């Protein structure tokens, strides 16, 4: 069989330059994992011996993938997911072989990869922290009819966690305009 790194079983065969050699248990051994096997043999003259087969290149372990993100905080920007592995020579078989994927919106992407011994796997990158929508404000007034009293304007939003500069209320002592400045956690 092979002496290259593999995720398959390896077959070792012992051969001799004489035909009168008998191998106890047969001259073939299949390794399902790395290790050693001792072939015991005897020839027609009664000479005995051993031959040791050693295999160290079976790798049936899937490379461990780690996915990191450019940010996990709420953001109004794209998010880049990067994949890395605990083994060298791992090849990404989709995404044009790139180890990064850029999310322009929330969702998921499945990286597909193969390790140096041929072990194939997948890892899913998930993003749910992208918010590119500006919060929609609603302004309400405590008095809506003509009045000679102060009027309080209150701003509310269609989403939570919106910060309003100088607070979410403004008291009008006279007729006029006021601009509320606000930002959500993602920076919109």
What is each of the regions a protein language model found here?
Residues 20-48, 90-117, 161-187:
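Serine/threonine-rich, repeat-prone extracellular segments and beta-strand-based repeat modules
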Residues 22, 80, 115, 136, ...:
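Intrinsically disordered, low-complexity tandem-repeat regions
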Residues 1-2, 25-26, 66-71, 96-98, ...:
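Surface-exposed, proline-enriched loop/turn segments that connect beta strands in immunoglobulin-like
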